[in-house]
Structure formats: structure tokens, C-alpha cells
């Protein structure tokens, strides 16, 4: 192409005009979402095969052609359609702040100062209402909010999610990461938090919090739309200024005609083509003029009254606030039952331990209500409780043998007898006390009407048979000692009486009775024979 034509001159050879024209057309129409004012200069350099730092005049002419075509392009027209929505968002946020924080808001406030007033009000509210670590963490999120295309961090404590925050962050992600277009069907209700999207506050504080948050979300919507509308023109002007500085060493002139005349001077017959443009040259004040159309307070577009009506009616996004019923009173805890109350004979056991009414408490050693008399003897000796010791009879209180209501075979047949049944003292009728066995006195006498114990011989057979019975019990007691000693002796008996098995090192002796009369079993342990012999002697 040769000759002077209407439009912007591009100092690029004609054989590259096809690829470059398509690239510039995709940017102007907005068909290629990957193109923006910030990266278009790099795309042009790649299209004309210029190395970085070279071809500044060719790139400068291409950027100047895009600059002149931008105001009337379809790309910018779609952004201009969002100017009323941005104005409405700013006006709504401003009027909401005038209603709840009039002392910190004035008609001369900039959007940035309005943002600081809202953040300060929310920070004070979170601290005064709760002040927990989660609230303090949200204070940092509020402080991190910046005007522009930035996602909103966590700013509302004690809530899992907030629909307006999700909407705004999704919009930012679409514009920044996906470089998509905004087709906004603006509705003030979508930027008003619901009652369950704020902490549990008093009614007045809840209205205050929802109003401030609605103002904050409207203001963030304004910042997003403002940057989206003006970003291309500002980025393109910045790139144009940089390449002009690189080509001439001077700052960008005030009039675009200076730049046009400079480029026309480099035109000759084979190194240029023209990009057709309509209208006059685009002034370099275009971004500022565009911003002046966005940052406007227009009361005719204000939606603050609608937002306040939504909040004061107790609804958010059309959802009414439910009325929660009062919780029923918590049931009183029952007192914890004692061990004696949980057993089947708890009442008798507790009265037996307290002693008979009006008398002296009998000498009763510590009793385990579960283990048997014979088998538990080894366990008690091994656990350090000592041998069973029967007190000598006194005139005021009979000797009481350990009572075992559950374990021994005798207990399954006789529910009230565990030991030797001898002459016993009758219990008063006012207290149900288990029969007490006494080994004092003559063993040949037996209380009339008492049941015969299958585990012990009858007292009528005399002391000789009772001594023989005790010797048999001693043998059984040695087996019990071996069973609970940890190592069971297995082997044949040698001539010297020892067995060829291994014996346990566990000492079953009772140090508390090593000095008692009558000696003890071999190894320090006391046998049942010597134990019961105390009462026979």
C-alpha cells in the first residue's frame, strides 16, 4: 500500500500486514480473551519477528493505531455498558455508610477513604462483640482488603461461607485468571449478606454488621468494575509511553498529533501500511476521562433504600429469619451410685461396714465382695494385703470373719453364710446384717437351725476332723500359690523332695506376720492350717 490514506500509519512491511492486522482486529473486537492492554505489545513484537529492544518504531506505530481505534471499538463499548452498574454500586455503598457511620462519612469522601471507614467500623464491631482469636484473625483479613481486582480474604468470623464474598471472588477469578467478560445483571440483593452469614449478634449489632458488610461488598463491586472498565486504556497508554520514551528519549506528548507527525516522517513506499480508523485522534487523557465517568455519585441510581429494607425486615436474599424455640431445661444429673448400691446386697453391705446400731463396730478386715475365700487368699497375700487375721473375741463385739456373698460354692446354696457356722449373735430386727461366724469357744457347739456348710466339716465331728480338713486345705493353698506365682511347677519329685521344674522368684511371704507365734509356712508364707489354729489353741 502506498500513498496517504485516512487512518493510522503502521510502519511494518506489507508482507507482515496480514498477521498483524488479524492480531489487532482480535484485540479491538475482544474476540481473543487472552489479549489485554498489558500484553498486546509483546504479541505485536512476536507477530513482526522483532527481537526485544529492537523495532521500537514499528511497535510504536502499531500501538498508536490501536490507541486511536480503542474508544469506538467493540471491546471498549462492552465495558462502557457497565459504567451505570459501577456508579450504582458506589452510590449505594456511600449512602449506606451515611446511614450507619455518618460521623466517618462525608459527601467529599473518595472510594478509598470510604473503604477505610467501613473496615474500621467492622474491626471495632468484631472486637467489641467477641474478640476471640478467630475475630482477631478476621481483623487481619479486613486490613488486607485493597481497592482493585483482588479477592476478598476471610473477614467474617464464626461463619463458614458468605454468598456475596463467593460471588465477588468468582468474578475476580474470571477477570484475572480466565480473562473473561463481565455480563452483570446487577441486583443489590446478591450483595446483601443473609442473617446466617454473619456472627450471632444482638438485633441492633446484626443490622449494623449486615449494613456495613453490604456497603463493603458494593464498594468492592465498584472497584472490580472500575478496573475492568479502565484497565485496557491505562495499560495501552503505559505501553505507548514506554516505547515513545525508548524511540525518542522524551515523555509522551500532551497532543496525539505530535506522535502522528513523528511516525509519518518514517513512512516511505515499502515499509508501511495503514489501519483504517474512524473519528479523530484519541486524546491521551482518555483514561482519566473514562475514570471520571465511573467515579460518580448519582442518587437516581442508588439502591441503598432497597438494601436497608431487606436488612430491617430480617431477610437476606429473600429468605426470612426463622424464630428458634427455647431449649428445654437440661435434666439434673443423678448422684453417682456407690459400689455398695450397685451390688445386689448393697444395703446390707453398707450397714454391715457401719456396724450394728447402738453397738461397737466389729473388727472387719478389708473385704473384696467378689473373690472366694480360698482362691483369693493367694491373691491377697501376693497383692500385699496380708494374711487373713481373725481378732480374738471381745465381750462387746464378736469377731467377724471375712464375708463373701458371691464367690464360694457355699454362697450359691446359702446366701447368708460363707465361713464356719458357729454360735453367732442375733442381729437386731432394725438392721439386716449378714450372719457373723465366730471361731471362738468350743467348736463342738453349733447354733440350732443353722445350715450345714459343705466346704467345712461339721463341728460335731470334733476338732480332729477339723485339723485334718485344714491340712488338706494347706495342700490346696500351695497349689494356688504356684498358680498365681507366674511360673507353674511341672516335673517329677526328686528323692530330696524337690521338683525338677523352675520355681518363681515371687515372694509370697507376708512380712506383716513374720513375727507371729506359731511360725509360718516354708518360705515365709502362712498356711491356712496355722491361720485357723490361732482360734483353736
Swiss-Prot record:
> Where is there biased composition of kind Low complexity?
423-441
* GO CC annotations on file: viral tegument
Claim: Glycosyltransferase is one of the keywords in the record? no
Its localization reads: Virion tegument
Q: Where is the composition biased (Acidic residues)?
A: 492-517
Instruction: Look up the domain of life of the source.
Output: Viruses
Keywords (A to Z) from UniProt: Virion, Virion tegument
Q: Which Pfam families match?
A: DUF832
Record keywords: Protease included? no
The segments labelled Disordered in the record are 325-474, 486-537
Q: Which InterPro entries match?
A: Herpesvirus_BRRF2-like
Q: Where is the composition biased (Polar residues)?
A: 334-347
Q: Which family does it belong to?
A: Belongs to the lymphocryptovirus BRRF2 family.
Specify the protein name.
Answer: Tegument protein BRRF2
Q: Which organism is it from?
A: Epstein-Barr virus (strain AG876)
Amino acid at each position: 500500500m502506498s500513498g496517504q490514506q485516512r487512518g493510522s500509519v503502521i510502519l511494518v512491511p506489507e508482507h507482515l500486514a496480514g498477521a498483524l492486522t488479524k492480531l489487532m482486529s482480535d484485540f479491538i473486537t475482544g474476540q481473543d480473551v487472552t489479549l489485554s492492554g498489558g500484553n498486546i505489545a509483546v504479541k505485536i513484537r512476536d507477530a513482526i519477528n522483532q527481537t526485544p529492544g529492537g523495532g521500537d518504531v514499528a511497535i510504536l506505530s502499531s500501538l498508536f493505531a490501536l490507541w486511536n481505534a480503542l474508544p469506538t471499538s467493540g471491546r471498549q463499548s462492552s465495558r462502557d455498558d457497565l459504567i451505570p452498574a459501577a456508579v450504582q454500586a458506589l452510590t449505594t455503598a456511600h449512602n449506606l455508610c451515611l446511614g450507619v457511620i455518618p460521623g466517618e462519612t462525608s459527601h467529599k469522601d473518595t472510594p478509598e477513604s470510604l473503604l477505610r471507614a467501613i473496615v474500621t467500623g467492622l474491626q471495632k464491631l468484631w472486637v467489641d462483640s467477641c474478640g476471640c482469636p478467630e475475630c482477631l484473625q478476621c481483623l487481619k483479613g479486613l486490613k488486607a482488603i485493597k481497592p482493585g481486582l483482588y479477592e476478598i480474604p476471610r473477614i467474617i468470623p464464626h461463619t463458614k461461607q458468605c454468598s456475596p464474598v463467593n460471588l465477588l471472588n468468582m468474578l475476580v477469578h474470571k477477570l484475572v485468571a480466565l480473562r473473561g467478560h463481565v455480563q452483570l445483571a446487577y441486583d443489590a440483593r446478591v450483595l446483601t449478606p443473609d442473617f446466617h452469614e454473619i456472627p450471632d449478634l444482638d438485633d441492633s449489632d446484626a443490622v449494623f454488621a449486615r449494613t456495613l458488610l453490604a456497603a463493603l461488598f458494593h464498594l468492592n463491586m465498584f472497584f472490580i468494575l472500575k478496573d475492568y472498565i479502565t484497565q485496557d486504556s491505562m495499560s495501552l497508554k503505559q505501553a505507548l509511553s514506554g516505547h515513545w520514551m525508548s524511540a525518542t528519549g522524551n515523555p509522551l506528548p500532551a497532543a496525539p498529533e505530535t506522535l502522528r507527525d513523528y511516525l509519518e516522517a518514517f513512512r516511505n513506499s515499502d515499509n508501511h501500511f495503514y489501519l483504517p480508523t474512524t473519528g479523530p485522534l484519541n486524546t491521551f487523557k482518555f483514561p482519566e476521562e473514562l475514570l471520571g465517568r465511573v467515579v460518580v455519585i448519582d442518587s437516581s441510581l442508588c439502591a441503598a433504600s432497597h438494601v436497608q429494607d431487606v436488612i430491617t425486615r430480617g431477610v437476606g436474599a429473600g429468605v426470612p429469619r426463622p424464630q428458634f424455640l427455647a431449649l428445654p431445661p437440661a435434666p439434673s444429673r443423678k448422684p453417682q451410685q456407690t459400689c455398695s448400691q450397685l451390688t445386689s446386697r448393697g444395703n446390707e453391705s453398707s450397714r454391715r461396714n457401719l456396724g450394728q446400731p447402738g453397738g461397737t463396730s466389729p473388727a472387719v478386715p478389708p473385704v473384696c465382695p467378689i473373690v472366694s475365700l480360698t482362691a483369693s487368699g493367694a491373691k491377697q497375700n501376693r497383692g500385699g494385703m496380708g494374711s487373713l487375721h481373725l481378732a480374738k473375741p471381745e465381750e462387746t463385739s464378736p469377731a467377724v470373719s471375712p464375708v463373701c456373698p458371691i464367690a464360694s460354692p457355699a454362697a450359691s446354696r446359702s446366701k447368708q453364710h460363707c465361713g464356719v457356722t458357729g454360735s453367732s449373735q442375733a442381729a437386731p430386727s432394725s438392721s439386716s446384717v449378714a450372719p457373723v461366724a465366730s471361731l471362738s469357744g468350743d467348736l463342738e457347739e453349733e447354733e440350732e437351725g443353722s445350715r450345714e456348710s459343705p466346704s467345712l466339716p461339721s463341728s460335731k465331728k470334733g476338732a480332729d476332723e477339723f485339723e485334718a480338713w485344714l491340712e488338706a486345705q494347706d495342700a490346696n493353698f500351695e497349689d494356688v500359690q504356684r498358680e498365681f506365682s507366674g511360673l507353674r511347677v511341672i516335673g517329677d519329685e526328686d528323692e530330696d523332695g524337690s521338683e525338677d521344674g523352675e520355681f518363681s522368684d515371687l515372694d509370697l511371704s507376708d512380712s506383716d506376720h513374720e513375727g507371729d507365734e506359731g511360725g509360718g509356712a516354708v518360705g515365709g508364707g502362712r498356711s491356712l492350717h496355722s491361720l485357723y489354729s490361732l482360734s483353736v489353741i
